[in-house]
Amino acid sequence: MRRDSDMASHIQQPGGHGNPGPAPSPSPGPGPGPGASERVALKKEIGLVSACTIIIGNIIGSGIFISPKGVLEHSGSVGLALFVWVLGGGVTALGSLCYAELGVAIPKSGGDYAYVTEIFGGLAGFLLLWSAVLIMYPTSLAVISMTFSNYVLQPVFPNCIPPATASRVLSMACLMLLTWVNSSSVRWATRIQVIFTGGKLLALSLIITVGFVQIFQGHFEELRPTNAFAFWMTPSVGHLALAFLQGSFAFSGWNFLNYVTEELVDPRKNLPRAIFISIPLVTFVYTFTNVAYFTAMSPQELLSSNAVAVTFGEKLLGYFSWVMPVSVALSTFGGINGYLFTSSRLCFSGAREGHLPSFLAMIHVRRCTPIPALLVCCGATAVIMLVGDTYTLINYVSFINYLCYGVTILGLLVLRWRRPALHRPIKVNLLVPVVYLVFWAFLLVFSFISEPMVCGVGIIIILTGVPIFFLGVFWRSKPKCVHRFTESMTRWGQELCFVVYPQGSLEEEENGPMGQPSPLPITDKPLKTQ
């Protein structure tokens, strides 16, 4: 009965006015419940090391073990393929610099969604949120989970593809395990991220070390200039763009730290520091991992391989070749954890702004974790794995993802124009967003020309959010029966998950971490020119 009495003092009564927006903070209940002695809010438990592992862990998933084949296929030579990997890291660095400025100018969790909502208004932010929650992150999580299960099951089925049912069951078991971990403790989740990020870096360090040993022994024929730039097909701008898109998939996840800004210790310092440490490190690791691949395999061998890292291990590691599939499995396990951690904060931020049901803006009374948002992310991913063709959906996801990146960085220029006097602890050179947007526009135009169906479906997915926005957010005078239903469901969900609205988090956003005014108002309307 102790648990029920504590919960009763924290049950929230959502207002019946139907206005979207941040939910009110609860009043502490009587007695020694958690609200009376300690504020219920998201805790600042992510330090610099954990922040770096979130970025590195989300970027390094299965991409570096799979993408080299696609990059080489469209580049036409070893030398140009290596150039594409360096270029991908450079463009990612430009984008991350822009996100660092936005992250300290708009110190709110939610990443792209928070920035687009703040700069362009509620509709634009909702469309980004809708596409992310509906398809982008559930599909990415499903693909990473399926990759994890396939590599774990590979030793059990060495001569054939693992059964689809076994892969799905193992994927869902992994997903539910990590959902439970993230629901139980932020500290547990970040420790898992640190451990598995360290593991995947050790695995890639092994590949790079073996590659350097090969070079010192003189086995680098494919890297000699005469061979490295021996093209087996005539290079073109179109093929180079496709190669870059293949490589950019391996860099996806670089913006995820911005989703958890409010849980960072001293975000104005640690957000840019983590970005400046992580992106160059990942670019270095990716480039020299590919150099190592080419010391063991010819371009033809690499193109014929379905799992480049596994082939590398079989050729050079001998008895220890089992290390490679295990490394990929560990890498994807950490990737699932990172995606769950950050995508749940996106749901949390969207609900707090009134763009998703208010129940998703609640956290556990004692654990201070966003359990409802985590359960929604887990459930949406499970549905995609059961009924969706994940590898077809990922094509649409890539287009939507890149579209969101460009719109967000365009928002940086809009913010510079509308609020020139805004205090910016970090202010990048204007050429940084301009160069990034030039690359972005080029890839977007080329994508429309080469894959009009994929781009068209991606835009349709985004636009399906327009009627949902007007029905669920813009229409405020809903019938009373709708309010009664949502209130009863919210109360039932609170009792089931033992959650309440966070206390004090909104006030901190409005007043700043040290009682100073926040640089931007909390609103879902576009900023006005001053």
Curated annotation (Swiss-Prot):
Question: Which residue ranges traverse the bilayer?
Answer: 46-66, 78-98, 119-139, 192-212, 274-294, 316-336, 368-388, 394-414, 430-450, 454-474
Q: Which GO terms describe its molecular function?
A: neutral L-amino acid transmembrane transporter activity
Task: Name any one Pfam family assigned in the record.
Answer: AA_permease_2
Main subcellular location of this protein, as a coarse class: membrane
Give the span(s) annotated as Disordered: 1-36, 508-530
Q: Which tissue types show expression of this protein?
A: Highly expressed in brain and lung, and to a lesser extent in placenta and small intestine. Expressed in a subpopulation of astrocytes enriched at glycinergic synapses in the spinal cord and brainstem (at protein level). Expressed in OLIG2-positive astrocytes of the lateral globus pallidus (at protein level). Expressed in CD34-positive, DPP4-positive mesenchymal progenitors in developing subcutaneous adipose tissue.
* pH-activity profile: Active from pH 5.5 to 8.5.
Please give the knockout or disruption phenotype noted for this protein: Mutant mice develop hyperekplexia-like phenotype due to impaired glycinergic inhibitory transmission. Administration of glycine and L-serine reverses the phenotype.
The record, for Gene3D superfamilies, names:
Amino acid/polyamine transporter I
Q: How does it sit in the membrane?
A: Multi-pass membrane protein
Task: Tell me what induces its expression.
Answer: Up-regulated upon adipocyte differentiation in response to INS. Down-regulated by treatment with rosiglitazone.
Q: Bias regions of kind Pro residues — which residues?
A: 21-33
Q: What would be one Gene Ontology cellular-component term for the protein?
A: plasma membrane
Where would you find this protein in the cell? Cell membrane
Q: Which InterPro entries match?
A: AA/rel_permease1, AminoAcid_Transporter
Catalysed reaction, written as an equation: L-alanine(in) + glycine(out) = L-alanine(out) + glycine(in); L-serine(out) + L-alanine(in) = L-serine(in) + L-alanine(out); L-threonine(out) + L-alanine(in) = L-threonine(in) + L-alanine(out); L-cysteine(out) + L-alanine(in) = L-cysteine(in) + L-alanine(out)
Single GO biological process annotation from the record: glycine transport
- Role this protein plays: Associates with SLC3A2/4F2hc to form a functional heterodimeric complex that translocates small neutral L- and D-amino acids across the plasma membrane. Preferentially mediates exchange transport, but can also operate via facilitated diffusion. Acts as a major transporter for glycine, L- and D-serine in the central nervous system. At the spinal cord and brainstem regulates glycine metabolism and glycinergic inhibitory neurotransmission by providing for glycine de novo synthesis from L-serine and glycine recycling from astrocytes to glycinergic motor neurons.
* Assembly and oligomerization: Disulfide-linked heterodimer with the amino acid transport protein SLC3A2/4F2hc.
Q: Which family does it belong to?
A: Belongs to the amino acid-polyamine-organocation (APC) superfamily.
Indicate what this protein is called per its UniProt record.
Asc-type amino acid transporter 1
Q: Which organism is it from?
A: Mus musculus (Mouse)
